[in-house]
Design a protein with these regions (language model features):
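Short, well-structured N-terminal submotif of metal-dependent ribonuclease cores
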Residues: 1-53
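Catalytic-site beta-strand/loop segments enriched in glycine and acidic/polar residues
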Residues: 78-84, 106-116
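PIN-domain endoribonuclease scaffold, especially VapC-family toxins
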Residues: 37-92
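Acidic, PIN/NYN-like endoribonuclease modules and their adjacent C-terminal/linker elements
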Residues: 118-143
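Acidic, metal-associated active-site segment
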Residues: 92-112, 126, 130
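Acidic, metal-coordinating catalytic cores used for nucleic-acid/nucleotide bond scission
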Residues: 38-39, 93-97, 117-123
């Protein structure tokens, strides 16, 4: 959501995208998680949109034993890979929703939508790499 707002889908340029998100949620085809909501900065245009438009169920809770268990498995896997220490620390940082998003999708049999692509690089843990490792489907906004 944050990258979409900054790049291709600015509110002033493409308001239909944001209406589409709400329609997809209403149809039961789209959710996000509480950790993503928590990353959105107060005073930001996206913050205002979330709190004025997104229903409370739009952001699923990651506070379940099943999600925490999957997240833990992902942290163990990431730490066992050849990623740089900085990449591992960034992925595990309390403010980073990426691992939680994949864990939530795994537990709930959902598809992760991301602008990231698979990468052999070791400087950043990419969502598609974690999805592949844990059997979670992913796509980008154009799929």
């Amino acid at each position: 959501m944050m990258r979409a707002k900054r790049q291709h889908y600015r509110f002033c340029f493409c308001p239909g995208f944001w209406d589409f998100l709400l329609a997809q949620h209403s149809a039961g085809r789209l959710r996000s998680i509480d950790k993503v909501r928590d990353q959105i900065k107060a005073g930001d245009e996206l913050h205002a949109w979330v709190y004025n438009n997104a229903p409370s169920k739009f952001f699923g809770s990651t506070r379940s034993a099943a999600v925490a268990n999957e997240y833990g498995k992902m942290m163990v896997w990431v730490n066992g890979q050849a990623y740089t220490g900085a990449a591992k620390a960034e992925f595990a940082h309390a403010d980073n929703a990426d691992g939680w998003l994949v864990a939530f999708a795994k537990v709930n049999s959902l598809t992760v939508v991301t602008h990231e692509v698979l990468s052999n690089g070791m400087k950043r843990v990419k969502i598609p790499n974690v999805c592949d490792q844990f059997g979670v489907e992913y796509c980008d906004t154009y799929d």
